[in-house]
Amino acid sequence: MKISTFALGLSIEMSRIFSFSILNSHFSIKQWIMSDSIVIIPTYNEKENIENIIRVVFGLEKEFHILIIDDGSPDGTAGIVKRLQKEFPERLFMVERKGKLGLGTAYICGFKWAIEHKYDFIFEMDADFSHNPNDLPKLYAACMEQGGDVAVGSRYCNGVNVVNWPLGRVLMSYYASVYVRFVTGMKVQDTTAGFKCYRREVLETIDLDRIHFKGYA
């Protein structure tokens, strides 16, 4: 499996590793999917950011769809998304879950949804602008044009490039990446990155039902 990693602000380092091991609509899947790419954004109390980040993504020259996985945000995040769905009915989708079930399970839920709906390129991105949505086309190009199976938006290829995070969280993430690289021998600089693009075929090789998380992981 070919992994492309790049600093987005963040660079693309190339390495090759081997993988370890709804929505009701009156349209057919082929009718309403007009993009090959979907961005999964987990949310919990993101009312301050969610509309802005959706509009930025939809303002990009490359067309992306968005899937929001909302964990019952008490601040009304889901209500904002529902309002925007009226404006973007064929590009913006949401799965609402009851309770704060965790980031990891949100992505698993999103992966299953995206695979079911036949998107070719499936992205992970945070809602709080700690990932720059303007870099989504770079991730797409790394997979589509450069042949990567997975593209990682790295914060650590060229020093440390992190925004909207407290220092303690930055240090924890950085040294966690160092530890994972040391233990596994992976050549990916940012092993804890949450800004990625996967080819659908890669995720289809993984039994997502066997992946389990504890806490808000």
Question: Residue locations for each model-derived region?
Answer:
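Short, well-formed alpha-helical segments that are part of the catalytic scaffolds
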Residues: 46-59
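A conserved acidic beta->alpha catalytic loop
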Residues: 70-79, 129
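Conserved catalytic loops of nucleotide-sugar-dependent glycosyltransferases that act on lipid-linked
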Residues: 103-111, 130, 134, 163-217
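Short beta-strand/loop segment that forms part of the nucleotide-sugar
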Residues: 63-73, 95-96, 125
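Cell-envelope/extracellular polymer assembly enzymes that use nucleotide-activated donors
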Residues: 36-38, 65
